Design a protein with these regions (language model features):
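Membrane-embedded and interfacial regions of multi-pass energy-transducing membrane proteins
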Residues: 1-280
Length: 280
């Protein structure tokens, strides 16, 4: 999980400063926290085995290390929030997905603290609480960030622009549908509903019904988002070769055409500013 989320962190760290028109806050802190998460990710595997008969000492060690992941993760969250603070935030499709990521991944991270505590994990292990936590981190984190990245670099990569109104509606649908699908599963887990069961007690039917309904909304929203991207090919809504719709200042936006040439640059680029110097 920790390794798969790292590329998403990079995407979000690119989207937020561009669409906030502000230099990213704490660049070095974000970079070092990424290395920290990559390292700590190799040391926390034991928190999945609290119910397997581990020694008390092992449980304490793995629980402590698991909590440690929250420090560099919190550094990233607060750095992104401070980047937006007093910035010129534009609610473009990429930014909508970035904001969704911040909310969903934060919930995923906070609920992971419960599973890192031995006393709580004994009761929550292999319940729907784990299912909800996992999806808030993986889908609410990795996939939502990936969708944001697609919408951010789509006009640059393919030279066509999608319908931004439809993209924003789809992004909102993904956010609402996702929470409607997986938040009830936290409640199911807290009530003792085990995962991997096709049949279950009547007391769980109502929450399962909510989750099933909103999963349809989530699926439809993702379908609309993807089809909107591919429709831009069919409609051939081409952008100007030198187009920079988001006002990005990194090399792919300032020194390449849309889409880029096979070797990116027609000539050696001359740097006249930093990649995030929006205040200059």
């Amino acid at each position: 999980v920790y390794i798969m989320i790292l590329p998403a962190f990079g995407i979000i760290s690119e989207i937020i400063p561009v669409h906030s028109r502000k230099k990213i806050w704490g660049y070095k802190f974000i970079a070092y926290s990424t290395l920290s998460i990559a390292f700590i990710g190799f040391l926390v595997w034991g928190h999945h085995m609290f119910t397997s008969g581990q020694s008390v000492f092992s449980q304490i060690v793995f629980s402590f290390i698991t909590y440690f992941v929250g420090i560099p993760t919190g550094v990233k969250i607060f750095s992104w929030i401070l980047t937006m603070y007093k910035g010129q935030v534009s609610f473009t499709p990429p930014m909508m997905y970035a904001l969704s990521f911040l909310f969903l991944f934060t919930i995923g991270g906070l609920t992971g603290i419960f599973l890192g505590a031995v006393a709580l994990d004994i009761h929550l292990h292999d319940t729907y609480f784990v299912v909800a936590h996992f999806h808030y981190v993986m889908q609410g984190g990795t996939i939502v960030a990936f969708l944001g990245g697609l919408h951010h670099w789509w006009p640059k990569s393919f030279g066509v622009m999608y319908n931004q109104t439809v993209a924003n509606i789809a992004a909102l649908g993904v956010f609402i549908g996702f929470n409607g699908t997986f938040f009830p599963q936290f409640l199911l887990g807290l009530r003792g509903m085990p995962r991997r069961y096709a049949t279950y007690d009547e007391q769980f039917v109502e929450l399962h019904s909510y989750s099933t309904f909103w999963s349809g909304i989530l699926g439809i929203s993702i379908f609309i988002a993807v089809m909107n991207l591919f429709w831009s090919f069919i409609k051939k809504n081409k952008v100007d070769p030198g187009s920079n719709p988001w006002g990005g200042m990194t090399l792919e936006w300032t020194h390449t055409s849309s889409p880029p040439h096979p070797h990116n640059f027609e000539e050696d680029p001359v740097l006249q500013h930093g990649p995030y110097d929006y205040d200059k």
